[in-house]
Amino acid sequence: DTGSVFGCGLAAFNCKLRIYYLEAGLRSGNLQHPYPEEGYRQMIARIADVNFTPTELSAQNLINEKVHGKIHIVGNSVLDNLIEFGKPTMLNKILITLHRREDHHWMDSWFNEIEKLALEYPHYEFIIPIHPNPNVQKHRHILKNVTVLEPLEHKDLIKILMESNLIISDSGGLQEEGSFFNKKVIVCRKTTERPEGISTGHL
């Protein structure tokens, strides 16, 4: 999605159209993690006329970078839409999502560790909606004691998240959504562009 945003932003810049960038200012501080999203985010913010940030920290990131566009803190529209789902529960489920390209070369190691956990804690249902990328799919045979699902619509994924006791993920969005529903999220990445979740104890 950041690639699509960057492509549209660059086209608008070339056509001298105004650019309004939603979810601006997320930063990990490492161009390789997440890759290529971190680079796209920095480049879009540089050419945007208006940057809409979700938090004070993300706004401060843009101030530190001395971007030329205006900066407005507007909150997170994704989380606004989660209110309609109601209150979460806490069942013996653990939701897993792993897909990031910087994780592809050790995806088999991640899956082996998940399989070990599923064997060690059989009273939990480990659930993974597996990503369609071939670099992920080729390792699905490792997951013999894990409930492997085909990719889910967002609303169905959120329903499982709301019932889960724990989330294990390399997703940026699930860090936000898990924190919103007061779930603990184990982040399978070297860094995160959402440090607010660390300060609240969810990540």
Positions of PLM-derived features:
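Nucleotide-activated sugar donor-binding and catalytic core shared by glycosyltransferases
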Residues: 1-128, 133-203
